[in-house]
Amino acid sequence: EHATGLALDITSESNQTLDETQAQTQEQQWLMKNCQNYGFILRYPKDKTDITQYIYEPWHYRYVGEEAAKAIMKKGITLEEYLAQIQK
């Protein structure tokens, strides 16, 4: 997904380890609340592994555009679920 140029990993300056501890940093807390305002989503949310087929990655964000990002985050769904809904 990184090869598309639409995904990136964002870590805290104080914690650059790519693991679940990222979710507790102030930076990630802010990003999780505000990323959709800039067109990004948390790509692999907690408890959605069965849908995304990826483990929870609180550092991995994907650009989808502001409208889609706000819809995805408001509904608490994944990109896969969103795409399935709009294709109906």
Language-model regions: role of each:
Residues E1-K88:
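Cell-envelope/glycan interface and biosynthesis
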